[in-house]
Amino acid sequence: MSDNTLKKELKLTNLISMAAGGMIAAWMVEIKFWFELSGPGAVVSLITCALLVLPLCLIYSELTSTLPYAGGENIWVSNAFGWNAGWFSCWGVMLLYIMAMPTVAYGIASMVGFLYPITFFQTKLIAAIILVIWFFLTNKELKILAKMQSIMFWSTLVVSITASIIFMTNHQWSYDNLTPWFPNGFAGYGAAVGLLIMKFVGFDLIPQLSEESNFPKKKLWIAFVGSLFLTVLIYGLAVIGVGGIVSTEWIAETDIVDPRVADIIGMHWLGVIIVIMGSLTCLTTLSSFWLCASRTLYGAAKQRQFTPIFTALNKEGQPWKANIVVGILSMYFTVFAPEAWINYIYTIYGAAAGVVYLLVTLSFLKLRKTKPNWERPYKVKAAMLMGIISIIFTLWVIYSSVVAMDMGAWIVLGLYLLLGIPFWVYAKSKQKTDPEKWGAIILSPDNQK
């Protein structure tokens, strides 16, 4: 494309389904970890986490409407604290997206195992094939993917809620089975509130896609709040539905929860439907993270934080060169990820997300003071209060994640951070040797249409 700009093709409903689809992945696989943290009380932890994420969503809504550029957090942090701080926030956001995709692919493969038992190697092979197929799809016109995701997400919403209602109305469901609500006490509840932030990483996909939206920016808050509500609804009902039938100990020993519970109540057909729709939901998650990872690179390249070749768009309006890099990184993590990957990712995710969200909150407060005249189609009420709540919450997320990280998680996180340093050094050196092509740029209303 000659103008090198992204197409504006996304409706409000598209953004809601893509953001919620990014949050709602293979819950029937990951729910084991939720029960391990806080038992049936995980539903309370999820609701608490969502309520604490809400101020952050409103902050994101204002910043997205003010600076609606692909790159999201990077652009905001760059405007508040400079090009270097923006670069490192960009690298942190990339970690969230890249590490999530293999996990989603594994989720699909694990659900396939419900229909036919497969080995860990076969799981990796299936996950790798899924990533290859999705690479080609992400280079197609965005509105095609958006329509596919909308159909898959809204269908899964209906199936998941229906399944949970069936569980709760079955004669084997008992409220007594939900007790004790918090087998690990307040410590388990608090840890879950901090670590389950991973299940809400998805609302932050909206800023990456906002440049391609075709509706008034003042309505962006609906996408944030709507996707958050739908996520809590599905997760909360799932916990109550299965928790009233099986024990926490049983959940810890099984491979995939909801379909196995369907078998227990004599509804194998329901388990098959859950697996099929769960797999489709994983595809929406995979697609959302992939699209946003490529647009993160696209936005960073426009600020000369990465090579300008990442701004190249194909005839469908997709950043195809950025898609190649995302595909390579995703494939690498998929092929070399150990079986304990799901144990690493919650803590690494929490630490990375906490730092990124803290930087975003601080940027929000600073830009309110330093750029008061910028047009804000959506403006947060009680800005200082929302900022303080978000700061306290993000610090708790960071703390909960760091204390739960084992040596394997620290090694993975450390290697990722070290991997980024050469890219940052290269960009800084090119600013000196080739300032015409690499001169630092910070996208803002002052220099963008």
List each language-model region with its residue ranges.
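Extracellular loop-to-transmembrane helix junctions
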Residues: 26-118, 122-123, 227-231, 409-419
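Membrane-interface loop-to-helix entry segments
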Residues: 122-171, 180-186, 224-229, 349-359, ...
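Membrane-helix boundary/coupling elements in multi-pass transport proteins
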Residues: 92-106, 200, 205-213, 271-307, ...
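A generic transmembrane alpha-helix motif of multi-pass inner-membrane proteins
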Residues: 48, 348, 352-353, 365-366, ...
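Membrane-interface "cap" regions at the ends of multi-pass membrane proteins
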Residues: 1-41, 45, 53-58, 69-70, ...
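TM-loop-TM module centered on a large, flexible mid-protein loop between adjacent transmembrane helices
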Residues: 75-76, 82, 114-118, 225-289, ...
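Helix-loop-helix junctions that connect adjacent transmembrane segments
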Residues: 42-43, 117-122, 150-276
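C-terminal membrane-solvent junction of multi-pass transporters and transport-like membrane proteins
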Residues: 12, 183, 309-320, 357-406
